[in-house]
């Protein structure tokens, strides 16, 4: 049974972009083929909820090799897109000390359906726990109204300067 939704999907106006790729780049360090978010469309810091999407394209680097003749978006890229969404949430509010929110781990990951080129993967993240050294989000991914994955994702502040 899928978990309870973090936000009523009918409340998400996917045409109302709050942050496009250029704006996301101001907060997230990923570039080129590792940029996995196209837009932020919902941002409610008081509720701890954010939503964005990735338009899955036919020309992406993984398409020729991840299930040739029937390309499927790799689950690891769904996880990466989720991590980037959570990183944006924290960076846009200056919640973490350090240069960016790094990927600390995932738990309770479940993939429920496939995501293919031509699909729009909508990801909703909800802040569950905040500590200065570790942040926990629950994320849910959708294609249309179908929940295609959900997971708990851990983030940790990363500084480009190494600690002595």
Task: Walk through the language-model features, giving the residues of each.
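Acidic, glycine-enriched active-site microenvironments
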Residues: 118, 129-142, 146-149
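Hydrophobic core residues within well-ordered beta-strands of beta-rich domains
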Residues: 34-36, 121, 135
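Residue-level recognition of beta-strand microenvironments
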Residues: 43-45, 114, 128-130, 156
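Active-site helix/loop of acyl-thioester processing domains in fatty-acid/polyketide metabolism
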Residues: 40, 72-96
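N-terminal leader/capping segments at the start of a protein or of a new domain
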Residues: 1-37, 42
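Hydrophobic beta-strand-centered segment that forms part of the acyl-chain substrate-binding groove
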Residues: 2, 9-18, 85-124, 148-150, ...
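Catalytic strand-loop segment that frames the active site of acyl-thioester-processing enzymes
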Residues: 32-73
């Amino acid at each position: 049974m899928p978990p309870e939704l973090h936000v009523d999907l009918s409340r998400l106006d996917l045409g109302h972009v709050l942050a496009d790729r250029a704006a996301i780049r101001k907060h997230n360090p990923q570039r080129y083929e590792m940029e996995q978010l196209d837009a932020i469309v919902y941002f409610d810091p008081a509720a701890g909820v954010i939503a964005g999407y990735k338009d899955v394209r036919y020309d992406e680097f993984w398409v020729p090799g991840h299930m040739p003749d029937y390309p499927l978006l790799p689950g690891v890229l769904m996880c990466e897109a989720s991590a980037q969404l959570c990183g944006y949430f924290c960076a846009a509010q200056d919640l973490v000390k350090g240069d960016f929110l790094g990927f600390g781990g995932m738990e309770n990951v479940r993939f429920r359906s496939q995501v293919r080129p031509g699909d729009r993967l909508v990801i909703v993240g909800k802040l569950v726990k905040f500590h200065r050294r570790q942040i926990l989000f629950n994320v849910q991914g959708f294609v249309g109204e179908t929940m295609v994955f959900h997971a708990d994702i851990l983030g940790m502040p990363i500084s480009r300067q190494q600690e002595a």
